[in-house]
Amino acid sequence: MSDTYLVAASGLAVCFFVLYLLRPKTALPPGPPKLPLIGNLHQLGKKPMYERCQEWHRQFGKLISLKLGFDNVVVIGSSQIARDLLDKKGAMYSSRPKFVMAHENVTKGFHTATLPYGPRWRLHNRMQLSVLNKRIVTRCRQVQEFESLQLIHELLFTNDFHPRFQRWANSLQTGLGYGQRLAKGDECNIHEMEHISRVFREIFATGTWLVDLFPALNHLPPLLAPWKGVAEQHYNRTIELFQLNTAAALSKTSWNWTKKIRSLTESQGLPPDEVNFLVGVMAEAGGDTTGVVLDMFTLAAALHPEKMAIAQKEIDTVVGTDRLPNFGDVDKLPYLAALIKECLRWHPAAPFGLPHSVMQDDTYDGYHIPAGTTIIASQWSINFDPETFPNPYEFRPERYLENPDLPISSFGFGRRACPGRYFAMDSLFISISRVLWTFNIRPIKQGKDDPPMPAWEFVMDGALLRPAPFKALFSARDIHRQRFVIKEWAAAEKSVDVEALYDAIEPAGGDFSAQEKEEPVLVA
């Protein structure tokens, strides 16, 4: 009797196993064939991941699926799909995958960008928006005008543009974040900030760390997990700088992000180092990406002087030759606005952005997207989608005048979009408008056998994409403009009280004008 029962039970188990094997497979989006255990990892080493995914989008469609280790990954290759999923279904698609190296090891769970969607992230977001809402950003414009004046003055005397762009961007961020300008660009602070930026770029690069692909490895003892020691060194160095900057900021008499955020009731319940991180990564991220975009602008200017000439003619018509462009000119310079958008599209600084994670099962266009799937909106594939951007490899600002509704993916999507995007666009407007007012930009060639400008040669710097090294000549458009900039900077350097500019951003007691007392429009 027992033998009969055993045979029957075994037969039933075999039936269930066969039915399991024959079950309908989950209808994930199409993608390249996968190997057991590693999935598609073996296909990612020969080319940058953004290029490989663009090839797969051409082969399999605008929505593709990959397997990286044990993780399902869905990569989006069109702005419409990105809006449908990340914008319209933001409540479902706003979390983050498990960043073991970045979130758990290097930043101890303090980095806003790696937090899963939930109450803690919303708290971080509210604190960030207290200094990045449109009302505050508008009142930062005097600081941006002052810093941009120093930038164009420096470029009159050097063609080494990258350090000048980086100083300008970092000085804006540390000035507002901590009340500490970087007037020279060789301050100890800037070198430490650049080191930390480099670390963050590396830890956020998709597929860099084996422990992110196989999280169980993080349970190994430190002797067998050398990345833990690396992470601890990075964390200690980062938090030491953030603590020093915070102490300096709190000692300032002028307004800054640190003092504002520390004054919020919401910050009182958080560990002090978590608040230090919140401000620190705001200062770090903005300086890093803005500098890269200005490098990309310089490349575009050297390669396409005819497009810059159109923008210069527009600026000259509106501004004239006896003053610099200012924020009062924004609405009068549509071609310049289109040129800035095209710079962001043509060479995206972060071709993959930061991945999202879907929090519950979803279906899109007949495909099943399981909960926990990593979602990547590939800015590279989106920006070079010929259905949205005809002749996508052509640098053509006119496309944004012909269709003002063309998307801009540079700042991300949905609820995890960059909260500093309004400030970033203001920074790009004032710097690029003043550079074009002052200079013609041309390539520098040492000899006839020198290679051409690297229009499509890039260097992956962690999660950021930089143009391959190149040289450019910044020459004043005429002697009048050169003398004007020198005179204006001499006067500003002597008379402008920068701390007073910081204090004017949010007067004591919140004494804004009647117009500014209206509810500010916050970043989504």
UniProtKB/Swiss-Prot annotation:
<dbReference type="InterPro" id="IPR036396">
    <property type="entry name" value="Cyt_P450_sf"/>
</dbReference>
<dbReference type="GO" id="GO:0004497">
    <property type="term" value="F:monooxygenase activity"/>
</dbReference>
<comment type="function">
    <text>Cytochrome P450 monooxygenase; part of the gene cluster that mediates the biosynthesis of various drimane-type sesquiterpene esters, compounds that exhibit diverse biological activities and are widely present in eukaryotes. The pathway begins with the synthesis of the backbone drimenol by the terpene cyclase drtB using farnesyl pyrophosphate (FPP) as substrate.</text>
</comment>
<keyword id="KW-0479">Metal-binding</keyword>
<feature type="transmembrane region" description="Helical">
    <location>
        <begin position="2"/>
        <end position="22"/>
    </location>
</feature>
<comment type="pathway">
    <text>Secondary metabolite biosynthesis; terpenoid biosynthesis.</text>
</comment>
<keyword id="KW-0349">Heme</keyword>
<keyword id="KW-1133">Transmembrane helix</keyword>
<dbReference type="Pfam" id="PF00067">
    <property type="entry name" value="p450"/>
</dbReference>
<keyword id="KW-0408">Iron</keyword>
<dbReference type="GO" id="GO:0016705">
    <property type="term" value="F:oxidoreductase activity, acting on paired donors, with incorporation or reduction of molecular oxygen"/>
</dbReference>
<keyword id="KW-0472">Membrane</keyword>
<dbReference type="GO" id="GO:0005506">
    <property type="term" value="F:iron ion binding"/>
</dbReference>
<keyword id="KW-0503">Monooxygenase</keyword>
<comment type="similarity">
    <text>Belongs to the cytochrome P450 family.</text>
</comment>
<dbReference type="GO" id="GO:0016020">
    <property type="term" value="C:membrane"/>
</dbReference>
<dbReference type="InterPro" id="IPR050364">
    <property type="entry name" value="Cytochrome_P450_fung"/>
</dbReference>
<keyword id="KW-0812">Transmembrane</keyword>
<feature type="binding site" description="axial binding residue">
    <location>
        <position position="418"/>
    </location>
    <ligand>
        <name>heme</name>
    </ligand>
</feature>
<protein>
    <recommendedName>
        <fullName>Cytochrome P450 monooxygenase drtD</fullName>
        <ecNumber>1.-.-.-</ecNumber>
    </recommendedName>
</protein>
<dbReference type="InterPro" id="IPR017972">
    <property type="entry name" value="Cyt_P450_CS"/>
</dbReference>
<dbReference type="InterPro" id="IPR001128">
    <property type="entry name" value="Cyt_P450"/>
</dbReference>
<keyword id="KW-0560">Oxidoreductase</keyword>
<dbReference type="GO" id="GO:0016114">
    <property type="term" value="P:terpenoid biosynthetic process"/>
</dbReference>
<dbReference type="GO" id="GO:0020037">
    <property type="term" value="F:heme binding"/>
</dbReference>
<dbReference type="InterPro" id="IPR002401">
    <property type="entry name" value="Cyt_P450_E_grp-I"/>
</dbReference>
